[in-house]
């Protein structure tokens, strides 16, 4: 039995295919979804989406949004997303270093919040590349 997974951003469809299982980062922690999962709607945190296709696991960096699960269909609408395989490791590492430097130079609460958000996004992209398969 499989699940139909659709990952959408405002600009494009990132994924639309059948999967065996996913592990999704939500605002209240990670949840695993298998076929016949109870219906749920949840906020999606900045984090990693793990996708199992048969014996292979893939990763995707998600930048926050919402997910709806029901009737073996999963729809994830996010601000932005990248497949782990599409992320350039050197560029992701440079972005992480820039985000860390921006946080250390942040002045005022607003700059600190924006720098922390940029740092979370950068860390998620690096994690999507470096995650170890199950």
From Swiss-Prot:
Membrane topology type: Peripheral membrane protein
Pfam families (UniProt xref): ATP-synt_DE (PF00401), ATP-synt_DE_N (PF02823)
Any GO MF annotation of the entry: ATP binding
One CC-aspect GO term: chloroplast thylakoid membrane
InterPro entries assigned: ATP_synth_F1_dsu/esu, ATP_synth_F1_dsu/esu_N, ATP_synth_F1_esu_C, ATPsynth_dsu/esu_N
Lineage: Eukaryota, Viridiplantae, Streptophyta, Embryophyta, Tracheophyta
Subunit structure, interactors included: F-type ATPases have 2 components, CF(1) - the catalytic core - and CF(0) - the membrane proton channel. CF(1) has five subunits: alpha(3), beta(3), gamma(1), delta(1), epsilon(1). CF(0) has three main subunits: a, b and c.
HAMAP family noted in UniProt: ATP_synth_epsil_bac
Location(s), subcellular: Plastid, Chloroplast thylakoid membrane
SUPFAM superfamilies attached to this UniProt entry: Epsilon subunit of F1F0-ATP synthase N-terminal domain
Keywords annotated in UniProt: ATP synthesis, CF(1), Chloroplast, Hydrogen ion transport, Ion transport, Membrane, Plastid, Thylakoid, Transport
Coarse class of the protein's main subcellular location: plastid
UniProt family annotation: Belongs to the ATPase epsilon chain family.
Reported function: Produces ATP from ADP in the presence of a proton gradient across the membrane.
Protein name: ATP synthase epsilon chain, chloroplastic
Gene3D superfamilies in the record: 6.10.140.480, F0F1 ATP synthase delta/epsilon subunit, N-terminal
Chloroplast recorded as keyword: yes
Gene: atpE
